Each structure stands twice: as structure tokens, then as C-alpha cells.
Amino acid sequence: MTNNDTRTQPDAPATTRFPRWPLWARVLLAPLLMLIAAFSPLLPQSPLYFFPDAAKWLNDPANAVGSAPLLLTLAFPTVAALFLVWLAMTRLQRRPLRDAGALWTRASFGLLGVGLALSFAVTFATALPFQSSARGVEDIGSPLWVGILAAVVRGVFMQGFPEELVMRGWLMQVLRDRPLVAVAVSTIIFGVLHYFSSGGQESAGERVLYLLNPTAFGFCAAAFVLLTRSIWPAVGIHAGMHLAHLAGALMGVAFESPTIWVISAIGYAVAGVVVLVLWHRRGGSTEVVIDR
């Protein structure tokens, strides 16, 4: 006897999907992610607020034993940015983290070197002829190896990689279908966020002039993403600036003056335009792809 009794089976639980945010919200998320990552070292450093004597000892740049481990906490933005961009990419863009540039390929090291070389070239070529306008050589104030470690940590792990992962990785992926718009938006937001950066500015007007430099090298970095399909040249530009300033301090070269900021910005802007022209001559692309 055939049993024709059919019972309604309970529906399988629906997979919870994070709602996709509108484009404007995903764009404005970029500066928030960048700021959270930038201030993340306060988390591992927070216990020091209860021990002011220990904090003073660790913050002494002449104290190599103490300052070196404290410098390692400045690498926390890399950890924070990786987590935040992973969360944003997988939940809001529904794409893997590697699409934002968090990958290392055979080409990555060379591309990082290109960014480093460009940053050194622009930094020194635009500063050396204008030393008469500079305000003094930067004082390292610490043993050489600590200064080098500080430049690498700040240039790569505190600023270079996390900021480029957010601004050139996440943000340009949000706008991936409009490459030139992605370049423009990431450049403007990156530049504006540097208004409160400390670079030797002595007035509100100088703060505006100072913005030209990070805005220009942000433009150059974004152009490199289109041409090379990688964020590593941009990371190299960031790290190269810090290492170039360290080398300049050792050589007696100064970099702080409105004239140098403006000339340096012109140097990065010209380099960015050249990179965009190369990208266009190679056929351009209809979307931002990061796979190297």
C-alpha cells in the first residue's frame, strides 16, 4: 500500500546576510576605518596610563631597551586594518579580503621597491634645492638602529600598509566600476584626513599648504594601483617618505618648509600623471583590479 501522505517539511533556516550599505555609506566608511586603525595603538598602550613612571621610561627616545618594544605597539594599526577591512569586504562588498590588496605575490616585492625608490627620489629632489627655506634638520634623538626601526614601523605597519589597505584597497574596491572616480575620491579623502597631521605647520594657512603633499602622494599612490594592480607601490611611497626623512636627518637635510611641501607635492602629482598616462596607453581598464 502506497502512503500518499505528504508532510510539509520545516524550512531550512535562512542564512543571515549583512545588509548591503548604499554606496555613499561605504565610501564614508573609509575615513572611519582609517581613524580607528590609526588610534588602535592606544589599546595595547592603555595599561601604561596607570604607571606614569614606566610610560616615561618607555617613551624616552634615548632608551633603546624601552622604546623598541613600545614601537612594536605602533604596528597595531596593521592588525586593526586587516580585521576591519576583512569585515567590511566580506560583509558589505561580499568579496574576499585579497581583493582589497591583502596579498603577496612574486611581483609584490619589486612593486614595493618601486614605491620606495620613487619616494626617495621625489623627497630629495624637491628638498635639496630649497634648503635655504627649510626650518632645521630633524633630530632623531635615539640610537640609529632604533631610528631605523621606528621609520620602518611607522612607515609600513603604522601608516603605509593600513592606510593604503583602507584608502586604496577598500575604498577603490567600493568604486571599482569607476576607476578614475576611485582615484579622485580616494585622493581627496586621504588628503583631507591629513589636515591635523603634524608636519611643522605654524599657522592655519600652512596647514592648508601642507595638505598638498599627502594629497599629491595619495593621488600618485592611487594611480599606481590602476597601473600595477597592487597596493604595494603605495605602501612603498609611504614607507619611503619616512626612511627618506631618516636618511635626510643623518645627512643634515631638512624637509620642513611650505616651499618644500609645495614642490614635493608637484613632484608626486607629476609622477601620478605620468603613471595615469601609462595606464591609459596600455588600454586602461573598466574596473579597479587588485591581484598582485
Report the location of each language-model feature.
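Short, Lys/Arg-rich, polar N-terminal cytosolic tail immediately upstream
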Residues: M1-L23
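Short, highly charged, low-complexity non-transmembrane loops/tails of multi-pass membrane proteins
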Residues: D5-P10, N59, S285-R292
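C-terminal membrane module of polytopic membrane proteins
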Residues: A239-R292
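Membrane-interface helix/loop boundary segments of multi-pass membrane proteins
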Residues: F161-S186, L226-S230
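Hydrophobic core of alpha-helical transmembrane segments in multi-pass integral membrane proteins
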Residues: M34-L42, P77-A88, L118-L128, I263-G284
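Small-polar-interrupted transmembrane alpha-helices in polytopic inner-membrane proteins
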Residues: V156, P179-Y195
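Juxtamembrane helix-loop-helix connectors linking adjacent transmembrane helices
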Residues: D5, S46-L71, R94-P162, D177, ...
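Hydrophobic alpha-helical transmembrane segments
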Residues: W24-L32, L71-L72, F109-A117, L149, ...
